[in-house]
Structures are given as C-alpha cells and as structure tokens.
Amino acid sequence: MAKEVTVYNNDVDYQSSLAYEFRNVVSKDKDLRMSSEAKIDIGYPTGFLGFDFMNGYKVHNNGETKYNLGISDGSMVMVIGRSGCGKSTFCTQMAANIVRPFKTSTIFEDSIEGGMVKERRMQLSGFNTEAEYKKRFVIRNTGITAETFLARIKYIHDLKLADPERFKYDTGYVDDEGNPIRLFEPTVYILDSIALIMPDDLVEEGEVSTNMSVTRTAKVVTDIIRRVVPMLKMAKTISFLMYPFVLRKLTWCIWNKVNLYLVVKL
C-alpha cells in the first residue's frame, strides 16, 4: 500500500513561516551576533589578477555585475613560502589594494621582520606620505602572543560593531525588498608569521623547544583561530597569515587550495 504524502505549496504566506517568526524576534535583539543576517559576500580585488580570478565566483544571473573577483570579506588566508620569497611584499601590496578605495579601511600588522621598515611599506603600498601611512597602517613589533593577537582582533571587531554606521558603505547591491545593502568597509590584518602566536606564559618562560611546548602551542593556536574566524566574518576583516616553509627553488607562482597559497621564486 502506497504511503500518503502531503505536498505543501511553496508559495505560502511569508508571515506564516518560521523564517518570519525568527527574524521578527531577533530584530528586537541588540546583540548583532543574533540579529545580523548574511545577505551577500563581497570580493575585494587585490591587484593580482590571477589571484583574484582564482578567488572569483558567479554572483548574479542577471544585472550588470555577474562575477565577484578578489578575496571575500571575512576570509582568513594562509600564505606559505620560504624565507625571502616575497610573502611580506605580496601581502603588503594586496592589503593596500584592498583598503585603498575605502574611507575608514586600515591595515593592522604584527611583524618582527627587520627588512619591512616604514619606508619600504610606503613604497610598496603607494601610501607614500606620512599622513596616508599613519591613516592606513597600524604596526606592532613587540608583545606579539596568541592572547594579544586574539585581543586585537576582538578590539577591531568591537570598535566596528559599536558604531556600525561610521564604518559602513553602500555596496551598490539591494536585497530582495529593494533596500540598499550596506556592509562594513574591509579591514586587513597581517600576521608576519604564524609562529608568533605562542601562549603568553611560554614566551615569558622561553619554553619553546620542549615537546610539551609544541603540543600546547598547537592547541592554543587552534583555539585562537577557531575563535577569530567568526569575528573576522562579522567585522568584514581579511586576515593574512604567513608561514615560512622550505621548498625547492621554483618559478614564482600562487597556488590556491582552500584559502592556502604558496609563494615561491627562483
């Protein structure tokens, strides 16, 4: 005997749906983690066309904008390459091209690299006056630990969410009801080396060579990344993490595999 199946009409009244009830409740909630709903992802061009193409995706079947090229807002990107291959140069230029069109966008960087001095950043980024540099870059080269990395990401997140209209811009898109979609202007955070984010106590004690320290550091870094990702997405922050890796000498290339990029040179 065939089982009777009830077929529901997809064109039901919106106000009778669970989606309507949920949005009606959370719209009264001041906690943006509950009331903010994703409507669109924006890709930000980096100035490297091959890189932007690999990160692109189709966004509309109709209208003027059919493709979104560049790095999506809220992304975390790992850039891998051996020492001296150009990771810092690559990330600095990408970051500058992402933030340049926006009024409030800033590049935060944790770096201990001696060669990447202010003058070199100014040259690479094109922000070559003191006023432009001060507006666009916030650099830290001491006190970098797992805890302070998380604290700075959270601080950026909290500042933007506390005054959203100050940091938002009109994307040029509209939602299903015809209302303009306004999103946070992108922020870029560069971490010079993933190895910098070690626990506070291990940095103070100098326990960097024991097996226990390595295991503990890995656990802390995993936890930090897990906690950082939602804040990056909410505050439209793009994070570049660099990792030194010894490789055979190859021609310069960028290899894409799930937000993992390889940068090497002759």
Regions picked out by a protein language model, each given a short descriptive name:
Residues 198-207, 232-233, 265:
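Conserved ATPase-coupling elements of RecA-like P-loop NTPase cores
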Residues 2-134, 138, 146-162, 166:
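The Walker A/P-loop phosphate-binding site
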Residues 136-147, 202-220:
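Flexible beta-alpha connector loops of hexameric P-loop NTPases
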Residues 153-189, 228:
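Short amphipathic alpha-helices and their capping/turn segments at secondary-structure boundaries
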Residues 128-140, 185, 237, 248:
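A short helix-to-beta-strand connector/capping loop
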Residues 6, 214-266:
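Phosphate-binding/switch region of NTP-binding enzymes
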Residues 193:
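Walker B catalytic acidic pair
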Residues 76-78, 106, 186-188, 238-239, ...:
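Residue-level preference for the first positions of well-ordered beta-strands
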